Design a protein with these regions (language model features):
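A generic structural signal for alpha->beta connector loops
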Residues: 29-31, 68, 90, 150
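Generic preference for hydrophobic
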Residues: 34, 48, 71, 121, ...
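Non-catalytic C-terminal accessory region of glycerolipid acyltransferases
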Residues: 104-218
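A short, well-structured juxtamembrane/interface segment
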Residues: 23-46
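Catalytic core of membrane glycerolipid acyltransferases/transacylases, capturing the structured
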Residues: 1-16, 42-99
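N-terminal nucleotide/polyanion-binding subdomain common to many enzyme families
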Residues: 16-22
């Protein structure tokens, strides 16, 4: 019923996602500890950019953000029985092999932001296969979107999710534990033009890498 009109029921679907994330994590003994560099006014929209080393990163950000938001992610997430529920309703699938798909996805993201909803985008675009993981180069899309909408970016450092659950637990298994998430100060984009997108991308990458490396991924 909710899926028939996701726009109308956006808030309720987002709450269901949050409840599922909390219950599923609690059931397997995975908890999240959030550390804020500065208080966040969640009544405003943001583009949330985090490093991506584990599927648990998704749950971490679901539990972090109390306001309505959408993920943008690879189109394959439509085929997952859990993420598929939300990528068919409130989240935004992206097929990077199709310019039309990419245009439509970022148009939806733009609309969301202008409605006051945040966007969560993993700027690396994928989880790497190397173990231990490292921070890959960032895609330009989130940063161009932030400039076009003049919405602040919140850099997020997810320190140790990969140590608890990596590679779908095929190689090293999984274990209970506490995932440490660092919420950095929002980066204001007001006054920036698209000519600043590359610099903004590199600044966010360096910031996340600095804090992740400093903590040793712990």
């Amino acid at each position: 019923m909710l899926a028939k009109n996701p726009e109308r029921h956006f808030h309720l679907i987002a709450r269901c996602r949050r409840i599922i994330g909390f219950l599923s994590s609690t059931f397997v003994g995975v908890f999240y500890r959030f550390r804020y560099e500065t208080p966040i006014d969640w009544s405003k929209p943001y583009i949330i950019c985090a490093n991506h080393t584990s599927n648990l990163d998704i749950t971490a950000l679901v539990l972090l953000c109390p306001s309505d938001f959408s993920f943008m992610g690879k189109i394959e997430l439509l085929n997952n029985p859990v993420t598929g529920m939300f990528f068919k309703t409130i989240d935004i699938p992206l097929n990077r092999q199709s310019r039309i798909s990419a245009f439509k996805a970022f148009k939806r993201a733009d609309d969301n932001l202008r409605k006051g909803r945040s966007m969560v985008i993993f700027p690396e675009g994928h989880i790497g296969e190397e173990f231990p993981p490292h921070l890959y180069d960032f895609k330009n899309g989130p940063f161009k979107l932030a400039i076009e909408t003049q919405v602040p970016i919140i850099p997020i450092v997810i320190h140790n999710a990969w140590k608890i659950f990596w590679d779908e637990a095929k190689t090293f298994g999984s274990r209970p534990g506490i995932i440490h998430v660092q919420v950095l100060e929002p980066i204001v984009t007001s006054g920036l033009g698209l000519e600043h997108a590359d610099r903004l991308r590199d600044d966010v990458h360096q910031l996340i890498k600095k804090h992740w490396t400093k903590a040793g991924g712990l």
